[in-house]
C-alpha cells in the first residue's frame, strides 16, 4: 500500500504468505508468523481512520488466507502480532484509536472467523500510542522531546508501554545521537517510575468524552472497513488502486492544511523566530559507515558473489531453481521446501526472485 518494498503483485504475494504460514504452523508452531502494521501507511499520509481500517482489512485478508489453507483459526490467530499502528500528536484521539482497534480486532476474529481462544482476539503490539515520526520536525529538533513525551503519556493511558519515542534527532538523519538516546530512555523512565503513568491500564474507562470518542473512531473505521470489504477485501482494494490513492490524497490534503496553517506545527508554520538554537549532537560513532569501506563495497560484494558462484555446485542450483519454478506454477503447492532447497544449494536471492518473477510477474505501481 505505502512502503514500496514489494516485488510481486498482491495475489502471488498472498500465496507466499500462505505458504509461509502453513509451513511455520507445521514446523515452527511457536513462531510469530506475521506482524500486521499500519505505521508505514499513516507515515505515508493516511488518516487515523484509514490507518485503522486498512490495517484491519489487511489482517482480515491474512486470517482468511490461513483459513482457506485449512488451518484452524485458533491455531494461528494467537501467533499474529501488530508491530504498530501510526501515531500523531492528538493524544485523546490516539488513545481512542487504540481502544477502538482492540474492540474491532476482537470482534473480527470472534464473529467472522469463529475463534474461541481469547488469545487470538487480542491485539499484541510492542508499541501502542505514539506520535509517529512524521510529527517530529527538523526545525527546532529539541521540541521533539516534548512531542515524544506526549506520545508516551498517550501510550500509558491506553494500556501500553509509555515510551517517549522517537529520539529527538530522528528528522536529522539515520543514527541517533548519544544525547537523543539518553533523553528518550530517561523520559520513558520518568513516565514509568516517577509519573507512574503505567500504573493504571485504562484510566479513561467510563469517561463520557473518551467512550464517545472511541465509539466515533470505531464507527468511522468500521464504515471504511466495510467499504473495502464490499470491494472484495484488502487485496482487491489494492489491485483497483483504492487504498494507495486514498493514502496519497490524504497526504496531499494534510500538507495543504500545514501550509495554510489550518494545522499547526510549532517552529515550522507558527511561532517562528529569527534566533534559532543551533543543535549539535554527538553521534554514537563518527560516521555511520567507513568512507573507505563504502568506496569499495560494490567491488568487494561482486568478488564475493563471483567466488560463491564459482565454488557452488551448478547442477544442484539449477535443479533447485527448476523445482521452484515448477511448483510456483502450481497454486496448490507449498513453496517453502523449494525455497529452503534453493538456499541450501547457494542460489542467490536474485536468482530465486527472478524465477518467481517469471511465474508471478512484477507489481506495478498504482497511478495516483
Report each predicted region and the residues it spans.
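Catalytic alpha/beta active-site cores
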Residues: 1-93, 112-116, 121-128, 162-166, ...
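Flexible, glycine-rich loop/tail regions that form catalytic "lids" or insertion modules at the edges
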Residues: 189, 193-368
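Conserved structured core elements
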Residues: 11-18, 28, 49-60, 74-78, ...
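Generic beta-strand/beta-sheet core signal
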Residues: 34-39, 83-87, 126-132, 148, ...
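Short acidic, glycine/serine/threonine-rich loops at helix termini
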Residues: 1-10, 37-51, 91-97, 135-142, ...
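Phosphate/diphosphate-binding loops
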Residues: 4-24, 102, 140-151, 180, ...
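Mobile "lid/hinge" segments at catalytic clefts and subdomain interfaces of large enzymes
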Residues: 17-71, 146-225
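Glycine-rich anion/phosphate-binding loop at the beta-strand->alpha-helix junction
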Residues: 56-59, 82-184
